[in-house]
Amino acid sequence: MSRPALLAVLVMVAVVCGCRTLPAPPVAAQSWEARRAQLQGRDHFQIKGRVAVAAAQEGFTASVRWMQNGTQSQLALDGPLGVGGLRVTTDGTTLVLVNAHGERLDSEAARAELKMRLGFDAPLASLRFWILGVPDPSSPAVEVVDVERRLTSLQQSDWQIEYADYVAVKGEWLPGRMTLRRADVRVRLIVDHWDS
């Protein structure tokens, strides 16, 4: 084979080898892991929005505010709820509920009142994570993530959470709309404002 012909063959082999598709590295899985860990570690944020709850044969809508300050979560619901609103504060072990009349209930009485008002046991400990678009690290979960490394659905603690919309907040994607379902309970949350 002549030198020009050999050179042409070598160039063709190099071009063909250079054009082959390499498998994508598993960056997305690692990136989701890093994003999830970062958001699960976030302990200061606030949202304002609207919630629609359907539980058994009952339902209501309300404005909602969630404030996370360290391990303390504060939930404020204003709307029908039979009396106009309520405030719930929990640190994961204790629960305090203050109703629209200023009456304060603690622990089991607060849990019973909250369940009666909402129509279901609210997963408050997990909500602080689900609001951020990540699973609660304290229990197993089944996660479905999109190409942007955002949860689209989550199954955890008998709840199914669907994330329908994300909004850009200070350079990162945070949930704008989600639906939580369990048995005969459906909760739709629309976040109108993030303060992270």
Language-model segment annotations:
Residues 37-57:
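A short, Trp-centered hydrophobic/proline-enriched beta-strand micro-motif
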Residues 72-121:
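An acidic-aromatic
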Residues 1-19:
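Sec-dependent bacterial lipoprotein signal peptides
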Residues 100-157:
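Flexible, processing/modification-adjacent segments and terminal tails
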Residues 133-196:
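Gly/Pro-enriched, hydrophobic low-complexity segments
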Residues 13-36:
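Bacterial Sec signal peptide processing site at the extreme N-terminus
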